[in-house]
C-alpha cells in the first residue's frame, strides 16, 4: 500500500553534541534520531540514540503542548547496547513512564503537568502535533529531535455539506472513485472529523456526519430520525467520487450502537465497524431530555432498554435488541474489557452470539482488549492517560476505564486490523490502486 501520509523523503531532525567519552583520545558524537520524523497520527516512528558508551545508562525525555495549551511529558531510562545505541522499538526501559519495548512508548505514556487536566486534547483543526525529544546524559541534555504527527494526510480534500445534512466529506488525494465510510460519533455529539480524516488519509471517502449538538441540530441525543442517516447514505451513493456498492458505516459508543442499528436497516451498508458498542438501543441522552427514546423510524419511537446505570431489565433488552443478523455485510466490533462507561465487552459478545445463533452469512469478529477502557482501539497514537472526563453534552464526569498502557496497546493492535477489515469487506481503498 502506498503511504500518502508520509512525506516523500525521510527527514531526520538531529541536534548532535560532540563530547569526549570512553577514554582519552576517543570522541563520540551523541545523536537522537527519529525515523521518519513526520508521520500520520496512526503511524509509529522509531526513536534511536547513538554514540553512547556500551552499557551506558541514559534517559530520553519527551514533551508536547496539546490543543488545549496543556503541557505533557514523559521520560524513560535505558541501557545502551554493545554498540552504544538505544532503539525504543527494541529495548524496554529500565525505569520511566512505561515499562515495555515500544517504538512510541514515550508518546503514549505522557502525562499532563497540570494535575487538573483530564485528558489529551488534539491540535485544533486537524493540525500538526509537534513532540520534542531530548537525550539526557549524566543529567545534561546532549541531543534533541522533533517528531511531527499529522492529523490528516497532505492533499486530503474537505467538502462541507450544505442543506439538511450536517457534515464534512473528506476525499483522499489519489485518483477516484473510492470506497466510502459513513462516520458517526457518540454521546459527545458534534462532528467526528478526526476519525474521518484518518480514513481519508488511508484512501477512503469518509463522511463525518453530525446528528446532534451541532449547528441547528438537536441539542441532545433524543428522538433522532433514522431516515436522516438514510439521506446521508443516498447522498454518498450519488457522489461520483464514491463507489455506491462499497459503503461502510463506523461509529463509537452510542455511535457504535447506531452503526449496528443502521447496518441492520439499510442494505446499502456493506460493512459495519462498531467501537465499544451496545447490542441494544438505549434511551435518550444526555441531560434533561424531552422524550425518553433516542431513535425514531417512520415517525415512531424505537423500543429502548433501561439506562445502563440503573441495572438490566431483560424484557426491555429483548424488545430493544438490535437485529444485527439483518446486516448485508461483515461486522467488526471492538471493546475494552475494563470499560468504565458501560459493559462494552459483554454487549459486543452479545452481538457475536446473536450472529452465531442466526447463522449469519457474512464474516464477523470481536476485538476485545484487556486493560483497555471506553477508548479501546482509538485510531491514533497519542497520550492515553486520562482522569475523569467531562461529557460535553451532559456536563457530567465519566470514568472511561482502562489504563494508559492498555488503551495504547489496543490502539496499536486495532489500527491495522480495522483497515484490513475494511480492505477485505469493501475492496482496495484509493491508496492501494
PLM region spans:
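Short beta-strand/loop motif that positions the catalytic acidic residue
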Residues: 327, 333-335, 339
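Acidic catalytic loop of the alpha/beta-hydrolase fold
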Residues: 338-342, 373-375
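Cap/lid segment of the alpha/beta-hydrolase catalytic domain
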Residues: 164-165, 176-238, 245, 283-287, ...
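Short beta-strand-to-loop junctions in surface cap/lid or active-site-entrance loops
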Residues: 166-177, 185-187, 320-324, 424
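Primarily recognizes the serine-hydrolase "nucleophile elbow" in alpha/beta-hydrolase
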Residues: 189-194, 230-317, 342-346
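C-terminal catalytic histidine-bearing segment of alpha/beta-hydrolase fold enzymes
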Residues: 349, 357-433
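Short, aromatic- and glycine-rich surface loops/edge beta-strands on solvent-exposed regions
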Residues: 100, 105, 114-138
